[in-house]
Amino acid sequence: MKITWHGHAFIEIQVAGKQILIDPFITGNPFTKTKPEDLNPDYILLTHSHRDHVGDTEELAKKSGATIVTEMDMVNDYAQKGFKVEGPNYGGTVHFDWGDVKIIPAWHTTANVPLGMATGLALTIEGKLIYIAGDTGLFSDMKLVGRKQQIDLAFLPIGDYYTMGPDDAAYAASLIEAKKVIPDHFNTFPPIKQDVNDFWKDVPENMKFTAEIDKPFEL
């Protein structure tokens, strides 16, 4: 599979002829050169309802007919608007021909509309486990994500203010013991301005993975 980090929390996965977008914050994203018209997603996965994660979801799904996958209560809003949806609750998994999406906890708030809880995502694709922490503070149950299988790749927010900062994110990396870790959700807005080296200095060398924005890599 090919994975592309488009800055902030926007991730693209290409696998088995499918395009999967996660938290497609494109319009207003100061990092990516990707435009909504460049994309034709089959699935859009959302961690929660804040605008910098929902982003261009509706425009993209209207154009491509993508299935929106998110937490059970939040997904109802999209279903009422006529979108194709899948909405498992915390701990639930939805199975697709390209992989599995499990909805897992995150410690964060959500917007008033659409309703729903903030989540993380555990993706099993081609036998590999990808942990998308979403917006979250540090919490001890993160270590359960990889209890049956080592996490191959984790995306952890480091921006502070709205999520955990570099210190807590580095501790989270030690908890989850992923093979590779990518920091996200930082330097997008003034309150989350960070020096990424404040995160890297406390992360074991073998876990460090630097993703170039808009540049796909193989997993």
From Swiss-Prot:
SUPFAM superfamilies in the record: Metallo-hydrolase/oxidoreductase
Phylogenetic lineage: Bacteria, Bacillati, Bacillota, Bacilli, Lactobacillales
InterPro entries xref list: Metallo-B-lactamas, RibonucZ/Hydroxyglut_hydro, UPF0173, UPF0173_UPF0282_UlaG_hydrolase
Family: Belongs to the UPF0173 family.
SMART domains found in the cross-reference section: Lactamase_B
Molecular functions (GO terms): hydrolase activity
Name listed for the protein in its UniProt record: UPF0173 metal-dependent hydrolase LSL_0324
Keyword terms of this UniProt record: Hydrolase
Coiled coil segments of this chain: none
